[in-house]
């Protein structure tokens, strides 16, 4: 997969070919057709939110499901999807009611687990 990868803060993103692992239980692989780099990414790129590097940026995306992991039933390969990954605690009242986008702990950047970048 080709991805925009941050390898060092305050440096331009690099477009790299990366390896991907197969999807695990309850995960899907999406062939991303378009992705945005937003203010969250900008804060990471500038070192405002320290993160382990290298990191794939662009967590707001649209694409096509290409592979399902075990247990996935809501989508199937060929489905068009949009997503915006946001970290969430899984325990607050919003997460407990399925509204993870409102999670009160979502700005805790230690919870951000994005794609790890490994060169192909």
Language-model segments: residues:
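Generic structural detector for well-ordered beta-strands
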Residues: 17-19
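Extreme N-terminal starter segment of soluble prokaryotic enzymes
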Residues: 1-2
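Glycine-rich beta-strand-centered segment in the early N-terminal region that forms part
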Residues: 21-35, 45-96, 101
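NAD(P)H dinucleotide-binding glycine-rich loop of Rossmann-like/cofactor-binding domains
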Residues: 43, 89-120
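Extracellular beta-rich ligand/substrate-recognition surface
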Residues: 5-12
């Amino acid at each position: 997969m080709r991805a925009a990868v941050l390898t060092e803060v305050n440096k331009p993103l690099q477009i790299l070919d990366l390896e991907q692992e197969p999807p695990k239980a309850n995960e899907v692989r999406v062939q991303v057709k378009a992705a945005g780099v937003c203010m969250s990414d900008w804060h990471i790129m500038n070192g405002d939110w320290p993160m382990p590097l290298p990191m794939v940026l662009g967590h707001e995306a649209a694409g096509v499901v290409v592979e399902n992991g075990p247990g996935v039933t809501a989508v199937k390969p060929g489905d068009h999807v949009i997503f915006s990954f946001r970290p969430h605690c899984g325990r607050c009242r919003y997460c407990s009611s399925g509204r993870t986008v409102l999670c009160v702990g979502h700005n805790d950047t230690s919870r951000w687990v994005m794609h790890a970048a490994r060169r192909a």
